[in-house]
Amino acid sequence: MSRILKNIAVSLWLLFIASLICSSKVRNVKNLNLRSVQEIYANMFAADSRVLDDDIAGGFAYSMYPNLSKINFSFGLNDTQKPLDERNGKTNFNGRFDATSIVQLNPKIKLRGGATYSRSVKKSVKWNSTSDFEFLYPYFLADSVGGDRHYEYYSFNGAYAHTAGRLFYAFSGKYKASHEWGEVDPRPRNIVSDMSLSTSVGYKSRKHMFSLNMAYRVYNQDQNMRFVNPDGANAIEWHLTGIGSHYARFAGNGIYIFTRYEGRGYTANLLMQSLSKTGLNAGITYNNIAINRLLVNQNYTPATNLYKHRAETFVTYRRQSGGLIYGAEVAVAAGFHRGIENISDNGITDNFKVLARLPMYKENLFDGRVSGLVQMTWRRSAVYFSPGVEFNRKLETYKFPAKSMSIARGTGNLKCGFVFSIEKWLLHIEEKPVYSYCYKSKLVNNDELMEPVIRRCLDRQFQIEAMNFFANNIRLSVQRQFQKIGSLGLSLSWTHSRFLDGVKGENLYISTYLIF
């Protein structure tokens, strides 16, 4: 662990020094507050931020703020009464460090880099012993005892873009890793590595940039479960397979709980990006990934195979008339997941051959989002309102015993904010109330042999997914520009949540940052 932390610290420090050196050569700190305002406006719509995503190599090639670095320290406090979803637990405190930088070395070459490190403790985790369980769902390890989990996460990303007239090409890479462990039985120790490489080619017209982007992803997780005394362990680990089903053959706390997940996938998208703060942005994306769950002590026999596909498209449009800017966003996405359970032999010859592959699990997803924007600007200030409505629908089915779970919900929000700039100061205030209503939910469970403890877990999961909730987020940011070092800022974000069964939550995030 100490070696990992040392490597992280050295890498972050080198990134910081490199950013300072580059910035001292090519940057001017006069317009840092203006660039911060541009960043606020550029990410007003959720879909617009997609063109600047770390996984897209060329998204920053013609950004409105070509030279910008930011170092951010933040920590969060959570005062939720109890975990809403026991599988995630609750995080009372977490700390985070972020560093990002975009540097234009010359008129043709632009670089981007970033790093993140965070540390937290998840309290009272139950019915989940696997990291990234939402991504691996429904195939993850779980038990009814649980406990606290220590969690570390770090990531590094970098990109290179080269322009030649109206054409450009770019390459990028991103590496994410996490370490999650428990100190009381059951003691999971999960190590995750997630790497993606992408390339982009594009064309710049007078008002837009068009790009084709391709990315390849490699995901691995090694799960090592330990007990002080397995013979007297008070927990049974289940390899869940969907809607309360599990691999009865591999249940227990012995050799079957050592697991490895291997995922390989790719992403392809077409993007059209406006080169100004108004105009049209649009994109279409397809991604898929295949994830195998391997039993380590059974000669890496594949217990399950999960295939995930997702397609999405979005269009955003802005128009300006004097000091008035207005716009709209429409986004639609659909996904389908297919799960296969493998039947293997008894391993007498240590081969553990797969004898049959059974398609048992299906999940269909649909998401739609519509939002608008009205922004009124004056010389030193601006006010904006952005209402939005989102619809989500999913249907899970399990083949035998026949089970299904369907959820449909609508969510509305109203984001409103105020931006004020005077001399070297910048003030940003934003409020976003959200209300989500589940208008359709149904659970069909024909499994008469399901263990009572798992049945209670399934009922609780269904209750959570069908729950209505209200949340309100208020954010305040104050930024002050200095001539030699850049801009220093402080940001406070407070969220109040209230759920149907009386659970309340309070979250406070405090960030201090330097922009240069």
Summary of predicted features, one role per range:
Residues 22-117, 121-123:
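N-terminal, post-signal peptide beta-strand-biased segments of exported outer-membrane/organellar beta-barrel
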Residues 116-154, 213, 220-223, 228, ...:
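Outer-membrane beta-barrel translocator/channel fold
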Residues 93-115, 192-215, 308-329, 408-419:
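Transmembrane beta-barrel strand/turn architecture of Gram-negative outer membrane proteins
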Residues 28-37, 205, 504-516:
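Outer-membrane beta-barrel "beta-signal"
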Residues 132-141, 239-515:
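Outer membrane beta-barrel transmembrane domains
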Residues 1-32, 516:
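Bacterial Sec-dependent N-terminal signal peptides
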Residues 80-96, 147, 178-192, 257-259, ...:
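Outer-membrane beta-barrel proteins
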Residues 159-183, 192-198, 281-296, 384-392:
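Surface-exposed extracellular loop regions of Gram-negative outer-membrane beta-barrel proteins
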